[in-house]
Swiss-Prot record:
Keywords: Chloroplast, Plastid, Ribonucleoprotein, Ribosomal protein
Gene: rpl19
Organism, as annotated: Trieres chinensis (Marine centric diatom)
GO terms of biological process kind: translation
Protein name: Large ribosomal subunit protein bL19c
Family annotation (PROSITE patterns): RIBOSOMAL_L19
GO molecular function: structural constituent of ribosome
Gene3D superfamilies the UniProt entry points to: 2.30.30.790
Length: 120
């Protein structure tokens, strides 16, 4: 069991490092994630666009798994939402899904992997 003082310190750290400007993201959304990349002494933002196939909610360790198909090859990346490397997250389109994890999209190709759009 953690002491009360230790728990307060952990809560303060969570409050300091959590981002406040994150839009509500659901499974099946098409998102555009801006990732900060440092090359030498230059810093730039590279955007990664794809479908959210999984989300793990764990306070400051919340992650998104985003999948896109690039030149016929499926590419998945896992992003820590509250990481300083993640610059921005923008929801481009919402889809109607009835699963919490969309791992079955890995086996679908072409038009079969499309999701039905939902207007919010």
């Amino acid at each position: 069991m953690l002491s009360l003082n230790t728990q307060k310190t952990i809560d303060n750290l969570h409050n300091v490092f959590t981002k406040k400007n994150i839009p509500p993201i659901r499974i099946g959304d098409n998102v555009k994630v801006g990732v900060r990349i440092i090359e030498g002494n230059k810093e730039r933002v590279q955007f990664y666009e794809g479908t959210v196939i999984a989300k793990k909610n764990s306070s400051i360790n919340t992650t998104l798994t985003v999948r896109k198909v690039l030149q016929g090859i499926g590419v998945e990346r896992i992003f820590l939402i509250h990481s300083p490397k993640v610059d921005s997250i923008e929801v481009l389109r919402s889809s109607k899904v009835r699963r919490s994890k969309l791992y079955y999209l890995r086996n679908l190709k072409g038009k079969a992997s499309r999701l039905k759009q939902q207007f919010r």
